[in-house]
UniProtKB/Swiss-Prot annotation:
This is Putative complexin-1. GO terms for biological process: modulation of chemical synaptic transmission; regulation of synaptic vesicle fusion to presynaptic active zone membrane; synaptic vesicle exocytosis. Positively regulates a late step in synaptic vesicle exocytosis. Disulfide bonds: none annotated. The gene is cpx-1. It comes from Caenorhabditis briggsae.
Amino acid sequence: MAGFLMKQMVGNQLNEVTGGLGLKDDGGEKTETGEDPEVVAARLEQEERRKEKHRKMEQEREKMRQGIRDKYAIKKKEEGVAMDFTEGRIGGPRKTPEEIAAEMNAEDDSIIGQLGLTEQVEKAKTMATGAFETVKGFFPFGK
């Protein structure tokens, strides 16, 4: 522990002295990130070479895949096409709650309409809702 503290104190003092004498390393121009422009240019060139190599490898792989597809008569999968899973389903397609409610209303209307009871059903509905509202007013949870 004592050795570490001594190195820190001596090192800091030594850095101050050399900095004061102008012995700092001014290794050329620095960019915003603190790197030489040559290093940045070399890194960009290396990245471009890597991307080009990757593109060529992917082309070769695709050519190989296409050869296999041709050999075994396999169709290429299209990513944009959505799969239709309804044909493998045991039951029919599911209906939304709105579709079910519409069917129920259509059935009710047709039976009631056939019997000529639409006016009586509407009266019964209004009386039931009025009674419900009246009863709801008596209970504390209905307010």
